[in-house]
Swiss-Prot record:
The N-terminal acetyl-CoA does not function as substrate in the catalyzed reaction, but is believed to have a structural role. 1D-myo-inositol 2-(L-cysteinylamino)-2-deoxy-alpha-D-glucopyranoside binds at residues 36, 179, 224, 234, 282. The keyword Iron-sulfur does not apply. PANTHER family: L-AMINO ACID N-ACETYLTRANSFERASE, MYCOTHIOL ACETYLTRANSFERASE. Catalyzes the transfer of acetyl from acetyl-CoA to desacetylmycothiol (Cys-GlcN-Ins) to form mycothiol. Belongs to the acetyltransferase family. MshD subfamily. This is Mycothiol acetyltransferase. It catalyses: 1D-myo-inositol 2-(L-cysteinylamino)-2-deoxy-alpha-D-glucopyranoside + acetyl-CoA = mycothiol + CoA + H(+). Gene3D superfamilies: 3.40.630.30.
Length: 315
């Protein structure tokens, strides 16, 4: 097998090769092997990159692993992909072992879709599932009409003047969350720069009563229309200020966002005429209350992503 090559940065050609690898693998597996944050990191120097090149000099990359640094009390996070035509050669196992060696065993691995090759690799390395992220979907029809309670005003994102309140609520709602917590203006700016960003898709709920501080954000629903998947929208981030919980804001914001997605996707056709437009979301499997709320809104389980770690480690 070709040698493993750790990098702190990737050239433009290497970035393109990794993106092509991800695209080819997604087409075969039906699920992206890495999350969008990994693609966002290809041009940065905030994570480490492990490359496996093909046997032909100057040929395409056939294996890639991204290793992000630890956040908070948790360990590092790795995501990897092997070209479908290069599987069963030990490349994935070798990359995973290299990541474990670099972190002294203190890292997790995301397995998107929890596919058979990922389960087999995890078993061979003595890894066990430590976290599950459920993808749920529902069709964009028969949407419950949202009811906006008294004392709440809804509007969409007006620009960077909203950022301070947006960050305050996000970081309070996701305190301790490994991916969504601890955001700064950098994370917001990166997402505003994405091709899919639409200010009308970022829905904000403000308090409007004598007891509320003027301009206080109660919650938000950041929706996303997938440019590469016609007819598919996403509940990208839904956050409610912990101090404003138990007021039905989460369900209200979810419904408003779904209505917004249905309006924006109404004229778009899916790649498969037999598949109707839909909205997806991700939720932690142990967040039972959220799962039940989404089920009550018509969402059902579509797939499950699993985070694996060495058995017996505190990851």
């Amino acid at each position: 097998m070709t040698a493993l090559d750790w990098r702190s940065a990737l050239t433009a050609d290497e970035q393109r090769s990794v993106r092509a690898l991800v695209t080819a693998t997604t087409a075969v597996d039906g699920v992206a092997p890495v999350g969008e944050q990994v693609l966002r990191e290809l041009g940065q120097q905030r994570t480490e990159h492990l490359l496996v090149a093909g046997s032909r000099p100057g040929g395409p990359i056939i294996g890639y692993l991204n290793l992000s640094p630890p956040r908070g009390a948790g360990g590092a996070m790795a995501e990897l992909v092997v070209h479908p035509q290069s599987r069963r050669r030990g490349i994935g196992t070798a990359m995973a072992r290299a990541a474990l060696a670099k972190t002294a065993g203190r890292n997790q691995f995301w397995a998107h879709g929890t596919l058979d090759p990922a389960r087999a690799t995890a078993s061979a390395l003595g890894l066990v599932g430590v976290r599950e992220l459920i993808q749920m979907r529902r069709p964009l029809r028969d949407i419950p009409e949202p009811t906006i309670p008294d004392g709440v005003v809804i509007r969409t994102y007006a620009g960077t003047s909203d950022d301070a309140e947006l960050l305050r609520v996000n970081n309070a709602a996701f305190a301790g969350h490994p991916e969504q917590g601890g955001w700064t203006a950098v994370q917001l700016a990166e997402r505003r720069g994405e091709a899919w960003f639409d200010p009308d898709g970022l829905i904000l709920a403000f308090g409007d009563s004598p007891r509320e501080r003027p301009g206080r954000l109660l919650g938000f629903h950041w929706t996303k229309v997938h440019p590469d998947h016609p007819g598919l929208g996403e509940v990208y981030v839904l956050g409610v200020d912990p101090a404003a919980q138990r007021r039905g804001l989460g369900q209200m914001l979810t419904s408003i966002g779904i209505v917004s997605l249905a309006r924006r996707l109404g004229g778009r056709k899916t790649l498969d005429p037999a598949v109707e437009p839909a909205v997806l979301l991700y939720v932690e499997s142990d967040n039972v209350a959220a799962v039940r709320t989404y089920q009550s809104l018509g969402f059902t389980t579509y797939s499950v992503d699993t985070a694996y770690a060495l058995a017996g480690t505190d990851n």
